[in-house]
């Protein structure tokens, strides 16, 4: 019994001493941390005492070397109209300022672990207003702002040896001069130009850190793919001196998918729609003309929409060539029907006049010949001749009517009033014909020479016996030509 009592007393004494030791360690630790905080506050006050923010580190000596690295947060927008792009990124700058060197304890215990760490002070961004910082700016900047939610996104970190890390997060809009000759099958190079505003290379030399850029692989753009980047540095000679400039260039490849569905595919379908008129009867004038005009206006609307999203540049772009050629194809389809209509009515009018002359070849003295020529069908045929697009045939109609059919032999009672009125137009048109003949004599000789030349050219054109041949060949020529154009277009720009 006595043995068990001694063991219990010994165990209790052991745990009591262990707890007391832990409590003592906590107290010592707390005192050390409290002393350290007091020492840090005193250290910061000491390093700022007598510190001149106007002078760069190592003033009057060797140039100060300032390291740079960037972390890309996001690409926000790229504008072809304004020739710029917007990007959000983190910029970190590194330099050494011996005036900010300090030594608190050498090593200390952290609150969360017992590992010793070197002296590093992470301070708020407001501390940057109390020390010297580089006057870094972006040479191609248009507009920038520093993020301030929930606090200003700035970082200042001091090392015991005077090393300074100065970081910030901001969004900037940078100029990017784009070459749009191959738009939208183009690729662009957009740069970030970093430079010191006031310090020349004799005072500040900037350089890229070993890992200059991060986050490019994770950045995404709706219309572009980032296929690579490169960094370089060079000296920029300006009116006020020579400055060190760091440059980061992004290689951007435009994605064609949006333009295929927004521009190219609708244009192709509109051109193919214009070919439908080749299968419509050539006498359906209203249908074919309406279809042709609709396709022309639709192509005009598409072209206007594309131009509204681009700057007003003078050179021709790839999409301009495609849209212009599509417009040419739909306009040519409309002109094709004009040729069909001209040929059809001109040929029909010639047949009518020939039939009238064959019907009444002699003088109008015999009543039976006059009755034969003066039928309802003849008058309707003369109306068709008046619709001919060839002016000479329209004028010849009235000459043949007056010369071969005597109005005194016409039995006007046999025909409806509309036909009788139509037949009475002969005198008026004969007067117009005589006036026109008098006007011709006053025209310049050059006009007559042009007419003779046009007649000679017209004589060389092969005569078409059937107007359907024009539509028949158009059904093959138009699709083949458009296919050949597309092959040449896409091969040229894709291989380029």
Swiss-Prot record:
Record-level Gene Ontology MF annotations: GABA-A receptor activity; GABA-gated chloride ion channel activity
Residues carrying covalently attached carbohydrate according to the record: 39, 189
Sequence ranges on the Extracellular membrane side: 21-258
Leader sequence segment: 1-20
A cellular component annotation (GO) from this entry: plasma membrane
Disulfide cross-links: 176-190
Domain of life: Eukaryota
All ranges on the Cytoplasmic side of the membrane: 343-472
GO biological process terms held by the UniProt record: chloride transmembrane transport
NCBIfam families listed in its UniProt record: LIC
Entry's family note: Belongs to the ligand-gated ion channel (TC 1.A.9) family. Gamma-aminobutyric acid receptor (TC 1.A.9.5) subfamily.
Function: GABA, an inhibitory neurotransmitter, mediates neuronal inhibition by binding to the GABA receptor and opening an integral chloride channel. Combines with the ligand-gated ion channel subunit GRD to form cation-selective GABA-gated ion channels when coexpressed in Xenopus laevis oocytes.
Assembly notes: Generally pentameric. There are five types of GABA(A) receptor chains: alpha, beta, gamma, delta, and rho. Interacts with Grd (alpha chain).
Official protein name in the record: Gamma-aminobutyric acid receptor subunit beta-like
């Amino acid at each position: 019994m006595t043995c068990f009592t001694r063991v219990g007393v010994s165990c209790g004494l052991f745990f009591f001493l262990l707890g007391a030791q832990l409590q003592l360690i906590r107290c010592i630790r707390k005192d050390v941390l409290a002393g350290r905080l007091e020492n840090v506050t005193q250290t910061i006050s000491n390093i700022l005492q007598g510190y001149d923010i106007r002078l760069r580190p190592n003033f009057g000596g060797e140039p100060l070397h300032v390291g740079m690295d960037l972390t890309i947060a996001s690409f926000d927008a790229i504008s072809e109209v304004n020739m710029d792009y917007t990007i959000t990124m983190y910029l970190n700058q590194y330099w050494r300022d011996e005036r900010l060197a300090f030594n608190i304890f050498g090593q200390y215990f952290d609150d969360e672990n017992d590992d010793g760490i070197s002296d590093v002070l992470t301070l708020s961004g407001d501390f940057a207003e109390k020390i010297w910082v580089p006057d870094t700016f972006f040479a191609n900047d248009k507009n920038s702002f520093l993020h301030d939610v929930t606090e200003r996104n700035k970082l200042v970190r001091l090392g015991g040896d005077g090393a300074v890390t100065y970081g910030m997060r901001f969004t900037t809009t940078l100029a990017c001069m784009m070459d749009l000759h191959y738009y939208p099958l183009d690729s662009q190079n957009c740069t970030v130009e970093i430079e010191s505003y006031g310090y020349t290379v004799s005072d500040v030399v900037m350089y890229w850190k070993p890992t200059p850029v991060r986050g490019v692989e994770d950045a995404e753009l709706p219309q572009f793919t980032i296929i690579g980047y490169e960094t370089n540095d060079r000296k920029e000679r300006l009116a006020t001196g020579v400055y060190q400039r760091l440059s980061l260039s992004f290689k951007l490849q435009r994605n064609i998918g949006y333009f295929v569905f927004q521009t190219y595919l609708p244009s192709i379908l509109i051109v193919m729609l214009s070919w439908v008129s080749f299968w419509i009867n050539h006498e359906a004038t209203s249908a074919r003309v309406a279809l042709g005009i609709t396709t022309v206006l639709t192509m005009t609307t598409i072209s206007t929409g594309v131009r509204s999203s681009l700057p007003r540049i003078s050179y021709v772009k790839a999409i301009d060539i495609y849209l212009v050629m599509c417009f040419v194809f739909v306009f040519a389809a409309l002109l094709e029907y004009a040729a069909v209509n001209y040929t059809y009515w001109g040929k029909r009018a010639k047949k009518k006049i020939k039939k009238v002359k064959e019907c009444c070849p002699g003088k109008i003295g015999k009543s039976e010949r006059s009755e034969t020529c003066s039928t309802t069908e003849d008058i309707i045929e003369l109306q068709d001749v008046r619709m001919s697009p060839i002016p000479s045939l329209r004028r010849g109609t009235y000459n043949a009517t007056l010369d071969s059919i005597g109005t005194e032999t016409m039995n006007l009672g046999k025909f409806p009033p509309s036909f009788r009125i139509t037949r009475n137009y002969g005198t008026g048109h004969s007067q117009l014909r005589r006036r026109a003949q008098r006007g011709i004599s006053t025209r310049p000789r050059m006009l007559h020479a042009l007419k003779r030349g046009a007649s000679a050219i017209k004589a060389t054109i092969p005569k078409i016996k059937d107007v359907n041949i024009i539509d028949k060949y158009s059904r093959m020529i138009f699709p083949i030509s458009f296919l050949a154009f597309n092959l040449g277009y896409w091969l040229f720009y894709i291989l380029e």
